Amino acid sequence: MTQKPEELPTHDVAGRFAAPIDQTPHEPAHWEKEADAIRLLLADKKRQIFTTDESRRVQEALDAETYWKLPYYERWIHGFSSLLKEKGVLQEAELVTEEARLRATGEDKVEDPPGHHHHHHDHDHDHDHDDHPYQEDDDAGIAVLSPLQLRGRAVRNLLVARGILSAEEIRAQIEAMDSRGEHLGARVVVRAWTDAGFAARLAADAGAAVEELGLSRGETVLTALFNTPAVHNLVVCTLCSCYPRSVLGRPPAWYKSRAYRARAVRDPRGVLAEFGTQLPEGTSIRV
């Protein structure tokens, strides 16, 4: 049974937001890349400290005002720091102590070159007006990390000190994500276009097929969808912005945005047109 929009949980934005989709490319700030890396490492097969579902549970328990106020990766920091405390890996007192040390030593300062402003490119906490797809950038020009950004740094330091993560692992994870992107997806598509056998293997087992090209299948099931003249596929995650990171890297800002996650479900044809894809009326769209 379909719920009325006002009855949907805060985090499930399907169909509830009509703003335009901001397609402006944005380069992640270092603290965002680091939060992304820490979250993935803590949940990997080596450590298995928590699951994606547990991380979602903590974030989805936030009240609506807080949920939409926090930038995407600050919600991630809230999620993994809360779970580390819940599971007894870290204690609140030691986090507070480390945060105080960081402030005392000046390590709570934003380290950007003069005149550079990084953006919360993955804001999906848009206000409810159609002409404002992203909240105004709130760290451009500031000099101090926000409380959750500082907590992320404190978590990192404590995990490294205890040997749960290493600085090298975090750096390698960031570099791995930096190296992935649309160019790798294009390699897969071109190979499928030019090699019917590979296309068949890609359809049957996308993870194994991309490994033929030296790419990673990742730790989740990778699936390839094939467009035809009759059916065009549009992929969206209305809950947590799931994305084929093992090939494409970090999801772009527009994919995580509140506008895309809401409108792709309700108006897929309009969303595709906004990205420059005009489909014949006879082509079905599968979301």
What is each model feature region?
Residues 55, 63-75, 79-94:
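Compact alpha-helical subdomains of small soluble proteins
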Residues 34-39, 44-46, 57, 169, ...:
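Short, amphipathic alpha-helical interface elements at domain boundaries
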Residues 34-44, 75-86, 153-161:
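Short, hydrophobic/amphipathic alpha-helical patches that form generic packing surfaces
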Residues 5-16, 26, 68, 83-85, ...:
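Terminal, compositionally biased segments used for targeting/anchoring and flexible tails
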Residues 23-27, 43:
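Acidic, low-complexity/disordered tracts enriched in E/D and polar residues
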Residues 15-18, 22, 32:
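Short, surface-exposed polybasic-aromatic patches that bind anionic ligands, especially phosphate groups
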Residues 2-3, 7-10, 14, 38, ...:
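Non-catalytic ligand/cofactor/substrate-binding and regulatory segments of enzyme domains
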Residues 51-58:
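Amphipathic, hydrophobic secondary-structure cores in small proteins
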